[in-house]
Protein backbone atom coordinates (compact mmCIF):
# COMPACT_ATOMS: atom_id res chain seq x y z
CA UNK A 1 0.00 0.00 0.00
CA UNK A 2 1.35 3.42 -0.97
CA UNK A 3 0.36 6.65 0.82
CA UNK A 4 0.44 9.97 -1.06
CA UNK A 5 0.38 13.57 0.17
CA UNK A 6 -1.44 15.87 -2.25
CA UNK A 7 -1.40 19.63 -2.51
CA UNK A 8 -4.87 21.22 -2.13
CA UNK A 9 -4.01 23.42 -5.11
CA UNK A 10 -4.43 20.34 -7.30
CA UNK A 11 -8.10 20.01 -6.34
CA UNK A 12 -9.13 23.65 -5.99
CA UNK A 13 -10.10 25.97 -8.84
CA UNK A 14 -8.94 28.92 -6.75
CA UNK A 15 -7.22 29.17 -3.40
CA UNK A 16 -6.82 32.58 -1.81
CA UNK A 17 -7.57 34.74 1.22
CA UNK A 18 -11.10 34.03 2.40
CA UNK A 19 -11.89 31.70 -0.51
CA UNK A 20 -11.40 28.12 -1.52
CA UNK A 21 -13.21 27.38 -4.78
CA UNK A 22 -13.73 23.72 -5.56
CA UNK A 23 -15.46 21.80 -8.35
CA UNK A 24 -19.24 21.50 -8.02
CA UNK A 25 -21.55 19.74 -10.49
CA UNK A 26 -25.20 19.95 -11.40
CA UNK A 27 -27.18 17.17 -9.76
CA UNK A 28 -28.69 16.08 -13.10
CA UNK A 29 -26.64 14.45 -15.86
CA UNK A 30 -27.26 15.82 -19.36
CA UNK A 31 -28.54 12.84 -21.34
CA UNK A 32 -30.32 12.78 -24.71
CA UNK A 33 -28.84 9.46 -25.81
CA UNK A 34 -31.10 7.66 -28.30
CA UNK A 35 -32.86 4.72 -26.70
CA UNK A 36 -36.00 3.02 -28.07
CA UNK A 37 -37.06 2.68 -31.69
CA UNK A 38 -40.62 3.42 -32.78
CA UNK A 39 -41.42 0.04 -34.31
CA UNK A 40 -40.52 -1.88 -31.17
CA UNK A 41 -43.02 0.12 -29.16
CA UNK A 42 -45.86 -0.40 -31.66
CA UNK A 43 -45.42 -4.05 -32.63
CA UNK A 44 -48.15 -6.41 -31.41
CA UNK A 45 -47.11 -8.41 -28.33
CA UNK A 46 -48.45 -11.97 -27.91
CA UNK A 47 -47.40 -14.85 -25.62
CA UNK A 48 -45.44 -17.63 -27.32
CA UNK A 49 -47.15 -21.02 -27.55
CA UNK A 50 -43.84 -22.80 -26.90
CA UNK A 51 -40.43 -23.08 -28.52
CA UNK A 52 -40.82 -22.58 -31.35
CA UNK A 53 -44.08 -20.67 -31.12
CA UNK A 54 -46.52 -22.08 -33.70
CA UNK A 55 -49.60 -20.95 -35.60
CA UNK A 56 -51.59 -21.84 -38.71
CA UNK A 57 -51.98 -19.58 -41.74
CA UNK A 58 -54.94 -20.05 -44.05
CA UNK A 59 -53.94 -19.37 -47.63
CA UNK A 60 -57.18 -20.28 -49.41
CA UNK A 61 -60.80 -21.23 -48.75
CA UNK A 62 -62.98 -23.80 -50.47
CA UNK A 63 -64.02 -21.62 -53.39
CA UNK A 64 -64.87 -23.56 -56.57
CA UNK A 65 -64.39 -21.98 -59.96
CA UNK A 66 -67.44 -20.73 -61.83
CA UNK A 67 -67.22 -23.74 -64.14
CA UNK A 68 -67.50 -26.09 -61.16
CA UNK A 69 -69.89 -24.07 -59.00
CA UNK A 70 -72.64 -23.54 -61.59
CA UNK A 71 -74.41 -26.76 -62.56
CA UNK A 72 -77.60 -28.01 -64.16
CA UNK A 73 -80.31 -27.60 -61.48
CA UNK A 74 -81.79 -30.95 -62.56
CA UNK A 75 -78.44 -32.71 -62.39
CA UNK A 76 -76.54 -31.40 -59.36
CA UNK A 77 -73.02 -32.82 -59.23
CA UNK A 78 -70.80 -30.90 -56.77
CA UNK A 79 -67.02 -30.81 -56.93
CA UNK A 80 -65.31 -31.60 -53.64
CA UNK A 81 -62.94 -28.94 -52.35
CA UNK A 82 -61.10 -28.07 -49.15
CA UNK A 83 -59.45 -25.08 -47.50
CA UNK A 84 -55.67 -24.66 -47.54
CA UNK A 85 -53.79 -24.14 -44.29
CA UNK A 86 -50.07 -24.02 -43.60
CA UNK A 87 -48.27 -24.54 -40.30
CA UNK A 88 -45.85 -21.75 -39.36
CA UNK A 89 -43.33 -21.44 -36.54
CA UNK A 90 -41.41 -18.67 -34.81
CA UNK A 91 -38.11 -19.59 -33.09
CA UNK A 92 -37.55 -17.80 -29.78
CA UNK A 93 -34.28 -15.92 -29.36
CA UNK A 94 -32.44 -14.75 -26.22
CA UNK A 95 -31.06 -11.28 -25.51
CA UNK A 96 -28.88 -10.67 -22.46
CA UNK A 97 -26.96 -7.78 -20.92
CA UNK A 98 -25.02 -7.34 -17.68
CA UNK A 99 -23.91 -4.45 -15.52
CA UNK A 100 -21.75 -4.76 -12.39
CA UNK A 101 -21.60 -2.38 -9.43
CA UNK A 102 -18.35 -2.24 -7.46
CA UNK A 103 -19.08 -2.25 -3.72
CA UNK A 104 -16.48 0.41 -2.94
CA UNK A 105 -17.74 2.81 -5.62
CA UNK A 106 -21.35 2.36 -4.49
CA UNK A 107 -20.47 3.20 -0.89
CA UNK A 108 -18.39 6.21 -1.89
CA UNK A 109 -21.29 7.49 -3.99
CA UNK A 110 -23.74 6.93 -1.15
CA UNK A 111 -21.55 8.86 1.28
CA UNK A 112 -21.12 11.77 -1.15
CA UNK A 113 -24.91 11.80 -1.71
CA UNK A 114 -24.60 13.86 -4.89
CA UNK A 115 -25.35 11.19 -7.51
CA UNK A 116 -27.24 8.74 -5.33
CA UNK A 117 -29.65 8.02 -8.20
CA UNK A 118 -26.94 6.70 -10.53
CA UNK A 119 -27.29 3.05 -9.57
CA UNK A 120 -30.98 3.06 -10.46
CA UNK A 121 -30.36 5.15 -13.60
CA UNK A 122 -27.65 2.85 -14.91
CA UNK A 123 -29.80 -0.23 -14.33
CA UNK A 124 -32.75 1.40 -16.09
CA UNK A 125 -30.45 2.41 -18.94
CA UNK A 126 -29.18 -1.17 -19.19
CA UNK A 127 -32.76 -2.33 -19.70
CA UNK A 128 -33.33 0.44 -22.25
CA UNK A 129 -30.06 -0.43 -23.96
CA UNK A 130 -31.12 -4.04 -24.39
CA UNK A 131 -34.48 -2.87 -25.75
CA UNK A 132 -32.64 -0.58 -28.18
CA UNK A 133 -30.72 -3.59 -29.52
CA UNK A 134 -34.02 -5.49 -29.65
CA UNK A 135 -35.73 -2.66 -31.57
CA UNK A 136 -32.97 -2.48 -34.17
CA UNK A 137 -32.96 -6.27 -34.58
CA UNK A 138 -36.74 -6.32 -35.09
CA UNK A 139 -35.99 -4.70 -38.46
CA UNK A 140 -32.42 -5.76 -39.17
CA UNK A 141 -31.92 -9.13 -37.45
CA UNK A 142 -29.61 -11.24 -39.62
CA UNK A 143 -31.25 -14.66 -39.34
CA UNK A 144 -32.50 -16.00 -42.67
CA UNK A 145 -35.27 -18.44 -41.80
CA UNK A 146 -38.08 -18.95 -39.30
CA UNK A 147 -38.23 -22.72 -39.78
CA UNK A 148 -34.48 -23.41 -39.70
CA UNK A 149 -32.66 -20.65 -37.77
CA UNK A 150 -29.08 -19.99 -38.82
CA UNK A 151 -27.99 -17.28 -36.35
CA UNK A 152 -28.72 -16.24 -32.76
CA UNK A 153 -30.46 -13.04 -33.91
CA UNK A 154 -34.06 -12.44 -34.97
CA UNK A 155 -35.13 -13.01 -38.55
CA UNK A 156 -35.81 -9.30 -38.98
CA UNK A 157 -38.95 -7.83 -40.50
CA UNK A 158 -36.93 -6.51 -43.45
CA UNK A 159 -35.56 -9.98 -44.21
CA UNK A 160 -39.00 -11.58 -43.91
CA UNK A 161 -40.61 -9.04 -46.25
CA UNK A 162 -37.79 -9.40 -48.78
CA UNK A 163 -38.03 -13.20 -48.56
CA UNK A 164 -41.73 -12.84 -49.37
CA UNK A 165 -40.76 -11.23 -52.67
CA UNK A 166 -42.67 -7.97 -52.22
CA UNK A 167 -39.97 -5.50 -53.25
CA UNK A 168 -40.01 -2.70 -55.80
CA UNK A 169 -37.29 -0.20 -56.72
CA UNK A 170 -37.99 3.38 -57.77
CA UNK A 171 -35.41 5.00 -60.06
CA UNK A 172 -33.97 8.47 -59.70
CA UNK A 173 -36.55 9.95 -62.07
CA UNK A 174 -39.55 8.12 -60.57
CA UNK A 175 -41.97 9.91 -58.28
CA UNK A 176 -41.63 8.62 -54.72
CA UNK A 177 -45.22 9.46 -53.82
CA UNK A 178 -46.68 7.91 -56.97
CA UNK A 179 -44.57 4.79 -56.50
CA UNK A 180 -45.73 4.26 -52.91
CA UNK A 181 -49.36 4.94 -53.82
CA UNK A 182 -49.15 2.44 -56.66
CA UNK A 183 -47.79 -0.23 -54.31
CA UNK A 184 -50.60 0.37 -51.80
CA UNK A 185 -53.20 0.20 -54.58
CA UNK A 186 -51.80 -3.15 -55.75
CA UNK A 187 -51.92 -4.52 -52.21
CA UNK A 188 -55.52 -3.42 -51.64
CA UNK A 189 -56.56 -4.71 -55.09
CA UNK A 190 -55.55 -8.29 -54.23
CA UNK A 191 -58.34 -10.74 -55.07
CA UNK A 192 -56.83 -13.42 -52.83
CA UNK A 193 -56.36 -11.58 -49.53
CA UNK A 194 -58.07 -8.75 -47.65
CA UNK A 195 -55.00 -6.58 -47.27
CA UNK A 196 -55.29 -3.34 -45.32
CA UNK A 197 -51.93 -1.58 -44.83
CA UNK A 198 -51.87 0.61 -41.73
CA UNK A 199 -48.55 2.49 -41.81
CA UNK A 200 -45.47 3.42 -43.80
CA UNK A 201 -42.12 3.27 -41.97
CA UNK A 202 -39.04 5.05 -43.32
CA UNK A 203 -35.90 6.85 -42.26
CA UNK A 204 -36.60 10.57 -41.57
CA UNK A 205 -34.32 11.48 -44.50
CA UNK A 206 -36.63 9.69 -46.96
CA UNK A 207 -39.72 11.21 -45.35
CA UNK A 208 -38.16 14.63 -45.86
CA UNK A 209 -37.69 13.84 -49.57
CA UNK A 210 -41.38 12.87 -49.78
CA UNK A 211 -42.37 16.10 -48.06
CA UNK A 212 -40.27 18.19 -50.45
CA UNK A 213 -41.55 16.33 -53.51
CA UNK A 214 -45.15 17.02 -52.53
CA UNK A 215 -44.37 20.70 -52.02
CA UNK A 216 -42.33 21.09 -55.23
CA UNK A 217 -44.40 19.01 -57.63
CA UNK A 218 -47.91 19.58 -56.31
CA UNK A 219 -47.57 22.56 -53.95
CA UNK A 220 -49.20 20.40 -51.29
CA UNK A 221 -48.38 20.17 -47.60
CA UNK A 222 -49.08 16.72 -46.21
CA UNK A 223 -51.81 16.40 -43.62
CA UNK A 224 -51.07 15.05 -40.16
CA UNK A 225 -52.47 12.19 -38.11
CA UNK A 226 -52.07 11.29 -34.44
CA UNK A 227 -50.68 7.77 -34.02
CA UNK A 228 -50.57 7.79 -30.22
CA UNK A 229 -51.19 10.21 -27.40
CA UNK A 230 -49.31 13.43 -28.12
CA UNK A 231 -47.45 12.08 -31.18
CA UNK A 232 -48.46 13.45 -34.58
CA UNK A 233 -46.86 12.52 -37.91
CA UNK A 234 -47.45 13.31 -41.57
CA UNK A 235 -49.91 11.14 -43.52
CA UNK A 236 -50.08 10.06 -47.16
CA UNK A 237 -53.46 9.69 -48.86
CA UNK A 238 -53.70 6.24 -50.50
CA UNK A 239 -56.28 3.68 -51.59
CA UNK A 240 -56.04 2.28 -48.06
CA UNK A 241 -56.84 5.66 -46.54
CA UNK A 242 -54.48 8.14 -44.94
CA UNK A 243 -51.42 6.11 -43.93
CA UNK A 244 -49.12 7.61 -41.27
CA UNK A 245 -45.54 8.23 -42.39
CA UNK A 246 -43.68 7.05 -39.30
CA UNK A 247 -40.03 8.17 -38.94
CA UNK A 248 -37.86 5.26 -37.83
CA UNK A 249 -34.17 5.91 -37.15
CA UNK A 250 -33.47 2.14 -37.02
CA UNK A 251 -34.08 1.93 -40.78
CA UNK A 252 -30.79 2.80 -42.39
CA UNK A 253 -29.94 3.73 -45.97
CA UNK A 254 -26.88 3.56 -48.20
CA UNK A 255 -25.07 6.33 -50.05
CA UNK A 256 -25.63 10.09 -50.08
CA UNK A 257 -29.09 11.30 -51.14
CA UNK A 258 -28.78 13.40 -54.29
CA UNK A 259 -25.81 11.46 -55.63
CA UNK A 260 -28.00 9.25 -57.81
CA UNK A 261 -26.80 6.06 -56.12
CA UNK A 262 -28.27 6.37 -52.63
CA UNK A 263 -30.89 3.73 -51.77
CA UNK A 264 -33.47 4.66 -49.15
CA UNK A 265 -36.02 1.95 -48.26
CA UNK A 266 -39.50 2.37 -46.82
CA UNK A 267 -41.93 -0.30 -45.69
CA UNK A 268 -45.68 -0.40 -46.22
CA UNK A 269 -46.90 -2.68 -43.44
CA UNK A 270 -50.04 -4.09 -41.89
CA UNK A 271 -49.05 -3.56 -38.27
CA UNK A 272 -51.65 -5.89 -36.78
CA UNK A 273 -50.05 -8.77 -38.72
CA UNK A 274 -46.59 -8.25 -37.24
CA UNK A 275 -46.25 -10.00 -33.89
CA UNK A 276 -43.62 -10.38 -31.21
CA UNK A 277 -43.98 -13.75 -29.46
CA UNK A 278 -42.61 -13.37 -25.92
CA UNK A 279 -41.71 -15.92 -23.26
CA UNK A 280 -42.76 -15.33 -19.61
CA UNK A 281 -42.85 -11.53 -19.88
CA UNK A 282 -42.97 -9.07 -22.81
CA UNK A 283 -40.54 -6.81 -20.92
CA UNK A 284 -36.91 -7.57 -20.08
CA UNK A 285 -36.37 -9.11 -16.65
CA UNK A 286 -33.54 -8.19 -14.27
CA UNK A 287 -31.78 -10.80 -12.12
CA UNK A 288 -29.36 -9.94 -9.32
CA UNK A 289 -26.68 -12.59 -8.92
CA UNK A 290 -24.79 -13.34 -5.72
CA UNK A 291 -21.75 -11.26 -4.82
CA UNK A 292 -18.53 -12.29 -6.52
CA UNK A 293 -15.18 -12.59 -4.81
CA UNK A 294 -14.61 -8.89 -5.53
CA UNK A 295 -17.94 -8.07 -3.80
CA UNK A 296 -19.38 -6.68 -7.04
CA UNK A 297 -23.14 -6.61 -7.53
CA UNK A 298 -23.98 -8.39 -10.79
CA UNK A 299 -27.21 -7.39 -12.54
CA UNK A 300 -28.22 -9.46 -15.58
CA UNK A 301 -30.97 -8.34 -17.98
CA UNK A 302 -32.70 -11.07 -20.00
CA UNK A 303 -35.38 -11.13 -22.71
CA UNK A 304 -36.76 -14.09 -24.70
CA UNK A 305 -38.91 -13.91 -27.82
CA UNK A 306 -39.14 -13.77 -31.60
CA UNK A 307 -40.73 -11.61 -34.29
CA UNK A 308 -42.90 -12.83 -37.15
CA UNK A 309 -44.30 -10.94 -40.14
CA UNK A 310 -47.52 -12.75 -40.97
CA UNK A 311 -48.47 -12.59 -44.64
CA UNK A 312 -45.01 -11.35 -45.60
CA UNK A 313 -45.63 -12.18 -49.26
CA UNK A 314 -48.87 -10.22 -49.62
CA UNK A 315 -49.67 -7.95 -46.63
CA UNK A 316 -46.42 -5.93 -46.56
CA UNK A 317 -44.16 -4.29 -49.13
CA UNK A 318 -40.65 -2.91 -49.41
CA UNK A 319 -40.14 0.17 -51.60
CA UNK A 320 -36.52 1.09 -52.37
CA UNK A 321 -36.03 4.67 -53.48
CA UNK A 322 -32.92 5.60 -55.48
CA UNK A 323 -31.81 9.22 -55.21
Language-model features, listed with the residues they occupy:
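Flexible, glycine/threonine- and acidic-rich loop/arm segments that mediate assembly and lattice contacts
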Residues: 1-239, 244-263, 269-323
Amino acid sequence: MKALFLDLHAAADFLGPGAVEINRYQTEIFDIVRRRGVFGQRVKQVPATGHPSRFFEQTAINSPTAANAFVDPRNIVPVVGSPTRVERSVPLKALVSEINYNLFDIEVGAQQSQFAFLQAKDLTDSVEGLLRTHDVALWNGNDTSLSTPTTAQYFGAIGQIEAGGNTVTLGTSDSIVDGIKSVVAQMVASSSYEVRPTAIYANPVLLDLIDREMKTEFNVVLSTVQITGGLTVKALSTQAGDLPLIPEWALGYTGTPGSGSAVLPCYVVSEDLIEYHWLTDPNPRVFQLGLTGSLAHQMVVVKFGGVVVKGASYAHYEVKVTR
